[in-house]
A protein has these predicted regions:
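Membrane-embedded helix-loop-helix hairpins and adjacent transmembrane boundary segments
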Residues: 1-462
Length: 462
């Protein structure tokens, strides 16, 4: 709250949306680590080591290449056009309906995605802390989102650049602290710790079997495409980058962030190995759901300091992804649908505050709806379906950037809606259609290609 007060004094709508383009690039780079490593990552990655070893690092290697592509291809475009909402590019290139379609798909996917991630983290916090005080889940969610609204409603992205830095510090510190505590309990020096992790069977990084879902090429290529789309074509992630002073600083931020992110993931994976070693040495049964491994050990076996660090870390992870998502939703809706830029400052403030409150309420309602469903498979299915909306966004941007053809703008919404539906049915019956082949992350690429094909069909040369 103190950071919010300091950063939001005299903040206008320009500060809320762009940070007045004065953010220090190194703060943006460090803060993006926490925003990218959501609460789901914080809980899931260490436990998943027991199932897939370090194979996740292959995907992260693709992420790093994707970050570099965003830095050299997309950031120059956004700075050249001086964009606030990145979906304004679609208006310039195709027309108003294409523009609204791209932005609408972002709003749906980001709202559901942010709610899903916050729902999972709120569930852990509810069991670990709030249930002891008989605080109902809905109140936990209202207070959580309410706090985010309080510290972001005035300063927006200008505040988030600074709060994300603090949240990333808490998140990474929690992991490092847990590793140190485990290594001390096992009497391992620094060198022995590194040797123990690197020699453990769970530290295998590369998998070359083609029929394995962990195959290097599948993971690496998927990592590239998913990053280009879910970072480079995502208002949430790009809004932070566009607060840097100029293109050069934004690119510098992206390159430094990519290395920081890579190191952070190695820490999470290393923690996973240490958790399994600790459990094995102490005869602790591994939970049926590996997602429960880190919370179970942190809160039940490592002592109060680690338990507190874990709760701080997971809270930081939840807030760092949810606060920027809420601000991005407000920005996109205000600019892309309410045309906020054409009004005077007083009217802009009213529109911005109203939009911010609207999406705060929607976020709460979606999370409570997930809880009411009380069926994890249904909730996960809703999250996956929302993820299909990124395919048309990929197709629209790629076609707009690399083709000079002019589309019939009124047909673009139909193409954008059809591509995910076609993709869904192909994915559902892929094992029958393609001799047992099952789609994974590459489904995003297929979705984008179907969109591009559809756009080609409804387009003509200039």
């Amino acid at each position: 709250m103190g950071v919010s007060w300091l950063t939001s004094r005299k903040a206008d709508t320009e500060a809320f949306f762009t940070g007045n383009r004065k953010s220090p690039w190194y703060l943006v780079a460090f803060g993006m680590v926490g925003a990218t490593l959501s609460g789901v990552t914080f809980i899931s990655v260490p436990g998943e080591v027991g199932n897939t070893a370090f194979s996740y690092l292959q995907f992260i290697m693709g992420n790093v290449v994707g970050f570099w592509l965003v830095a050299v291809i997309l950031l120059p475009l956004y700075y050249k056009l001086n964009l606030v909402s990145i979906y304004s590019f679609l208006d310039t290139r195709f027309g108003i309906r294409s523009y609204k379609t791209g932005s609408f798909f972002f709003l749906i996917s980001k709202l559901v995605g942010a709610a899903f991630r916050l729902y999972l983290v709120a569930g852990v916090l509810q069991i670990a802390f709030f249930d002891a005080f008989n605080i109902p889940f809905w109140l936990t969610v209202v207070v959580t989102v309410g706090l985010i609204w309080v510290y972001t409603f005035k300063g927006g992205i200008k505040t988030i650049v600074w709060t994300d830095t603090l949240q990333t510090l808490f998140l990474v510190s929690a992991v490092v602290f847990t590793i140190i505590v485990i290594s001390k309990s096992l009497n391992l020096s620094g060198a022995e710790l590194i040797r123990t992790i690197s020699n453990h069977p769970h530290s295998q990084i590369f998998f070359w079997e083609w029929d394995s879902p962990n195959n290097f090429f599948k993971q690496f290529i998927a990592g590239i495409f998913i990053t280009v789309v879910m970072v480079g074509m995502d208002q949430d992630m790009m809004q932070k980058n566009l607060t840097c002073k100029n293109k050069k600083e934004a690119q510098k931020n992206m390159f430094v962030f990519s290395f920081s992110f890579f190191i952070s993931v190695i820490l999470f994976l290393s923690l996973g190995v240490m958790l399994y070693i600790f459990a094995g040495k102490n005869g602790i049964a591994i939970p049926a759901r590996t997602d429960d491994l880190y919370p179970t050990l942190a809160l039940g076996y490592f002592g109060l300091p680690v338990g507190i660090a874990f709760l701080l870390g997971i809270t930081a992870a939840a807030y760092s992804s949810a606060d920027s998502a809420l601000t991005a939703l407000t920005t996109s809706f205000s600019i892309d649908f309410l045309n906020i830029e054409k009004y005077n400052e007083n009217k802009k403030q009213r529109i911005k505050k109203g939009s911010h409150l609207l999406f705060s309420v929607l976020l709460v309602l979606v999370i409570i709806a997930f809880k009411a469903l009380n069926n994890e498979s249904i909730v996960v299915a809703v999250f996956k379906v929302a993820g299909y909306t990124y395919g048309p966004i990929l197709g629209l941007f790629v076609f707009g950037m690399y083709s000079k053809r002019k589309v019939v703008d009124k047909w673009v919404p139909l193409i954008a809606l059809s591509a995910p539906v076609i993709c869904y049915f192909i994915s559902s019956y892929s094992e029958i259609l393609f001799n047992g082949y099952k789609f994974g992350f590459e489904l995003l690429v297929l979705n984008g290609l179907i969109t591009i094909l559809g756009l080609f069909v409804i387009s003509r040369k200039y």
